[in-house]
């Protein structure tokens, strides 16, 4: 029985979209390297004691009925080379701040990037994970919402929450990878359900438009000026522009926020979280 369970977990973690098996050798090698780096990072973090969170997400307030979903996208950068507990960017200090932020903002869906296993303990108890267990860009959904997982790939994973297709992306600045990621995201779009794609795309809006992303920027639709979403740890004055994005198709964005409050720590990550309310 134990062997069967292990096999099923391995299959869930290794599931990818049908096109991934045909990835070029260079990207397959890069993916293997990323997996090894993630494993090494998780092993290093696992050596440090982590207390389980006793907090839970607050119940939805009365305003939830007036919108379809609230989505948080956040590259948390769980692991940093600085493992000194007194450091202002110590990973556990930042994850405790992340937990406070989630409880304050009360999202329905959490789309993370660069989240290694120890950091998942800081996701409040009111959420459940949807999709593969071993990827670093997981999706969490508030318990009680209808959600089902679907395709999972190296650079993204998708699920459907309350009839909305949600695609969580962690892409690259590399032009070839950006092109391939956009093509794969476009392939997830159907006429049957509205869609939202979010995450750390690592490139600016103009680049994604140039390579043919078939979705609209929620920030642009709402008339929100662009701002730098990359909060560089080492070079805080260096500007990269907005590289974390929300895109929609068949949905109405209601409000967009870039979260600059650090919730009691110096910086939660080298990216600012972004928050979007949408309606069907």
Q: Which stretches of residues belong to each language-model region?
A:
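A fold-wide structural signal in alpha/beta-hydrolase
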Residues: 70-72, 165-167, 277
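Metal-dependent phosphoester-hydrolase catalytic domains
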Residues: 23-60, 151, 160, 175-180, ...
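Bacterial N-terminal signal peptides
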Residues: 2-10
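Solvent-exposed, acidic/flexible segments
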Residues: 87-95, 113-116, 133, 175-179, ...
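Active-site metal-binding loops of divalent metal-dependent hydrolases
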Residues: 74-76, 115, 169-171, 199-201, ...
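N-terminal, active-site-proximal structural segment of metallo-dependent hydrolase catalytic domains
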Residues: 12-121, 280
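Structured beta-strand-rich core segments of catalytic domains in phosphoester-bond hydrolases
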Residues: 49, 60-63, 109-176, 254, ...
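Short hydrophobic/aromatic-enriched beta-strand-loop microsegments
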Residues: 74, 128-133, 215-219
């Amino acid at each position: 029985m134990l062997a069967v369970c292990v096999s099923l977990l391995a299959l869930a973690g290794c599931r990818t979209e049908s096109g991934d098996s045909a990835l070029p050798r260079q990207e397959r090698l890069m993916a293997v390297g990323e997996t090894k780096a993630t494993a090494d990072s998780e092993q290093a973090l696992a050596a440090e004691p982590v207390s389980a969170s006793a907090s839970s997400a607050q119940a939805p307030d009365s305003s939830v009925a007036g919108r379809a979903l609230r989505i948080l996208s956040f590259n948390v950068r769980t692991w940093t080379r600085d493992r000194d507990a007194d450091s202002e960017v110590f990973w556990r200090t930042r994850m405790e701040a992340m937990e406070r932020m989630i409880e304050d903002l009360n999202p329905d869906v959490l789309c993370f990037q660069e989240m290694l296993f120890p950091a998942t303990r800081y996701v409040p108890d009111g959420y459940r994970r949807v999709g593969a267990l071993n990827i670093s860009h997981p999706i969490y959904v508030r318990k009680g919402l209808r959600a089902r997982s679907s395709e999972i790939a190296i650079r993204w994973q998708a699920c459907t929450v309350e009839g909305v297709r949600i695609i969580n992306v962690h892409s690259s600045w590399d032009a070839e990878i950006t092109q391939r990621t956009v093509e794969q995201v476009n392939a997830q779009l159907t006429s049957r359900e509205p869609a939202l794609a979010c995450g750390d795309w690592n490139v600016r809006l103009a680049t994604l438009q140039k390579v043919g992303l078939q979705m609209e920027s929620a920030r642009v639709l709402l008339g929100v000026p662009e701002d730098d979403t990359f909060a560089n740890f080492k070079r805080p004055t260096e500007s990269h522009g907005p590289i974390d994005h929300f895109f929609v198709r068949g949905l109405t964005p209601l409000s967009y926020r870039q979260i600059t409050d650090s919730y009691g720590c110096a910086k939660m990550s080298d990216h600012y979280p972004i928050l979007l309310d949408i309606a069907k």
